[in-house]
Every structure is written in C-alpha cells, then in structure tokens.
C-alpha cells in the first residue's frame, strides 16, 4: 500500500497552474505507485476520493557535465481530478 510519503511533490508549472483552476491537481510520485494506491492515499489523508486519476511515466533526462554522463531519476506524474468543492488547504499556492 502507498503512503503519503510516496507523494514527492505537487507540480507547479504553467500548465499545472492553468488546469488547477478546473479542479485538477498534478502530483509527482515514485514510479511504483499505482492509480488505486493514490486514490486510497487521497481518501485516507485528505478525506475525499478523486473523481478521476490519469497517470504517465516520465523518463529521467540524460545530463552531461565535463564529459561525465549521468541520469536524473525517473518519476510518475498523476493528474488528479478533485470532487466539486474539495480543497487541500496545505497545498494552496
């Protein structure tokens, strides 16, 4: 089962702030979290079940510095549609 610690961060990009107005929250998690586990986390910790959850895997970028090649970590991104009137006060911008 997933825990609240599996949510790495809330993404604040131009796109995520635009769709946040329509009640969609963009969440970055570890790649092992599933849609159902994320729904359970929202129900347990925030007191509501999301209307819809869409997910995608984001591959880590290859970065080079002074001839040494490295890779950023891969992550999973979720688009969580909140129910009408639901707010998460601690995550407000």
From Swiss-Prot:
InterPro entries assigned to the protein according to its UniProt record, in alphabetical order: Nucleotide-bd_a/b_plait_sf, Ribosomal_uL23-like, Ribosomal_uL23/eL15/eS24_sf
Keywords for this protein: Ribonucleoprotein, Ribosomal protein, RNA-binding, rRNA-binding
Cited SUPFAM superfamilies: Ribosomal proteins S24e, L23 and L15e
MF GO annotations: rRNA binding; structural constituent of ribosome
Recorded GO CC terms: ribonucleoprotein complex; ribosome
GO biological process: translation
Pfam family, one: Ribosomal_L23
Family affiliation: Belongs to the universal ribosomal protein uL23 family.
Role summary: One of the early assembly proteins it binds 23S rRNA. One of the proteins that surrounds the polypeptide exit tunnel on the outside of the ribosome. Forms the main docking site for trigger factor binding to the ribosome.
Quaternary structure and interacting proteins, as annotated: Part of the 50S ribosomal subunit. Contacts protein L29, and trigger factor when it is bound to the ribosome.
Protein name: Large ribosomal subunit protein uL23
Organism: Wolinella succinogenes (strain ATCC 29543 / DSM 1740 / CCUG 13145 / JCM 31913 / LMG 7466 / NCTC 11488 / FDC 602W) (Vibrio succinogenes)
Name of the coding gene: rplW
